[in-house]
């Protein structure tokens, strides 16, 4: 199966789609007016210290102060001696920072909703093969590099470039890479860090010291270890910029770059636009006839699996098992496609067979292993729910593309026509007792107004008799179903 990246560029927006086997697996979107700031380094100033929350707010020049927890401040632990095994405890925030103090911080989570960005003082600088860790003295290796001999080789090579400036983490893409390429990467990261430290010496505060790469370059860097067959770009300027970027940092990717000039929009090649639309819906259909219901809330994401129309096996246990197995693949894809993070609760269809539960869990873990974002599956809880987490750094596709519904205000439901009709009648009675008027005029949405004139007309007539006044109903086309006004005449 082929894998490729499609880069779609307009003056205000860049979108990158990752296609594997002809199917959209990931979509990355960046808008000029709302560029993500994860990875950016700032010189900020502590604006508030909150001992009760073990946190501080830091002004880094954004609209909202950013959040810094004590556990994200380095050095953030101290050893408690006198026990058989060492324990590490987070030091009190008041001992670590003070109001008005200048700090160099890095953004680890974009602002989301009412929350400001989340920060750390544990700075890291990523490149193609390495991650530079200022102040560290060790070399770490990605767990995805399984060969022990290769891990040792890489550690030995990279250890030579560790000094007082910092240490390194060796990324998965470094597997099999020669010493020259690793040395070049290490030197590049140290040059970047030197520039950051020079900028930090400036007397002013609340400004950016380092900016993460633009979306297209960042995705190419992060996909450097992926087996891509081609990278198609529909913008000449972006294509040339990526040629320059890959020629310097990822030369083997250069030959895969193509400037797409076809008449058909680039995303139409793989039905990407429709896939994006489907990724905004709650319901995800499974090929078997079953389906998922995905609900994203501020606290967590929940996924519910249902058999739906799937009755393909005589044995109910087998039907449930096969639906759950199919669901694991769909869930893993949807988490990547929608960029869902944080706590995720999965409600598989109940299984009494312990072997079936074990195999479903294994299938989920295998499907998630393809995810480039860190995931952790905790297994089935006592209530039969699977609890897992997925690292959240950037906004989900829903938060990028959608606003809160102005009708239901994020509830996901609106009051029924019947409910609104009865609210209007109660309001008429309330106003009648409070004020003097000759008659009432009700403005309501088309559906509610029609109901008041139709099936609820008898109830409205009883209200007229009770208040002793005429009630006239008028349609207001611009009102949503819950809106109405009762006007005294």
Swiss-Prot record:
Localization: Cytoplasm; Cell inner membrane; Cytoplasm, Cytoskeleton
Membrane topology: Peripheral membrane protein
Regulation: The presence of a 5'-monophosphate on substrate RNA accelerates its cleavage by catalytically activating the enzyme. In contrast, another group has shown that the enzyme has a higher affinity for 5'-monophosphorylated substrate, which enhances substrate binding in vitro and the decay of RNA in vivo.
Listed EC numbers: 3.1.26.-
Outcome of substituting residue 172 to V: 82-fold reduced activity on 5'-PO(4) substrate, 4.9-fold reduced activity on 5'-OH substrate
Cofactor(s) this protein requires: Mg(2+)
Recorded GO CC terms: cytoplasm; cytoskeleton; plasma membrane
Keyword Ion transport: no
Family classification: Belongs to the RNase E/G family. RNase G subfamily.
Cited function: An endonuclease that acts in the processing of the 5'-end of precursors of 16S rRNA, generates a precursor with 3 extra nucleotides at its 5'-end (which is matured by Rnm). It prefers 5'-monophosphorylated over 5'-OH or 5'-triphosphorylated substrates and cleaves single-stranded sites rich in A and U residues; contributes to RNA turnover. 5'-monophosphate-assisted cleavage requires at least 2 and preferably 3 or more unpaired 5'-terminal nucleotides for cleavage. The optimal spacing between the 5' end and the scissile phosphate appears to be 6 nucleotides.
Subunit comment: Homodimer, in equilibrium with possible higher multimers.
Name of the protein in its database record: Ribonuclease G
Native species: Escherichia coli (strain K12)
